[in-house]
Design a protein with these regions (language model features):
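Hydrophobic residues embedded in beta-strands of well-ordered beta-sheets
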Residues: 180-182
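N-terminal core-binding DNA-recognition domain of tyrosine recombinases/integrases
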Residues: 2-14, 25-39, 49-125, 138-143
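A structural signal for short hydrophobic/aromatic patches embedded in well-ordered alpha helices
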Residues: 44, 77, 137-138, 205-206
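Basic, Lys/Arg- and aromatic-enriched nucleic-acid-binding interface segment
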Residues: 90-92, 105, 109-164, 168, ...
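C-terminal catalytic core of Y-nucleophile DNA break-rejoin enzymes
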Residues: 187-207, 213
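A short, basic/aromatic helix-end/turn motif that makes direct DNA contacts
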Residues: 169-175
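Hydrophobic (often cysteine-bearing) scaffold residues that line and stabilize catalytic clefts
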Residues: 16, 20, 40, 44, ...
């Protein structure tokens, strides 16, 4: 029997007779999972736990075997996840799909009942600012000393096209003043990115470092 080694324990490659809970456990000890950011790992674990505990036709979804779980079961589970909202239900489908496909690529199974879940579409929740609105915000933030930190966060997010949350947790160690570059790890994808800092933003960062660094 094949195994994958983890720092915590050795995990056997599941069989088609294994339960869904074993498929999830196998994924949680994979390099694919470990490559995610710490926040994403925590979110995946939380939602996968809910998925396994979802009652479908009198049984917990996690107790279904790989060969017995059908599209009917995954769609019924999805309907229950919708109680928590469309976005949450779709997120749970996505994380379950990641776990399922990890084993599927190792020929544990050849069917994909997760892919057959009929999802509902969500309404876009992102509000897009115009360039003028961003500049107006920055003028206001930089015009008041107590708001300057907020202005810098938004300024960096705008210039680097990165998530505001990632900008908020940057430290001075992420800023390479001599190379005029910011080095960071994206929270969502876990990717390392290295971005040039424009002159005007660099000037503001130097001032902030002098005042608070």
């Amino acid at each position: 029997m094949g195994v994958l080694e983890s720092e915590e324990k050795v995990v056997d490659i599941p069989k088609h007779t294994s339960k869904l809970s074993a498929i999830v456990d196998f994924y949680l000890h994979s390099n694919n999972f470990r490559s995610l950011s710490a926040k994403s790992q925590k979110d995946y674990e939380k939602h996968l736990d809910v998925i396994l505990k979802t009652n479908v036709e009198g049984r917990l979804l996690g107790n279904y075997t790989v060969r017995s779980i059908k599209a009917r079961h995954t769609n019924l589970a999805y309907e229950k996840w919708l109680v928590s909202g469309v976005r949450t239900a779709n997120y749970r489908k996505a994380v379950l799909s990641a776990a399922w496909k990890y084993s599927m690529r190792l020929d544990v199974m050849d069917n994909d009942p997760v892919r057959l879940i009929k999802t509902k579409s969500t309404k876009p929740r992102k509000v897009k600012w115009t360039r003028d609105q961003v500049l107006c915000f920055l003028d206001t933030a930089y015009g008041n000393f107590k708001w300057r930190s907020i202005g810098l966060i938004v300024h960096m997010a705008y210039e680097f096209a990165q998530r505001v949350g990632d900008m908020r947790i940057l430290t001075w160690d992420n800023i390479n003043f001599s190379e005029q570059r910011v080095d960071l790890t994206q929270s969502k994808r876990g990717a390392d990115v290295h971005l040039p800092i424009p002159d005007d933003l660099l000037s503001m960062l130097r001032q902030q470092s002098q005042d608070f660094g």
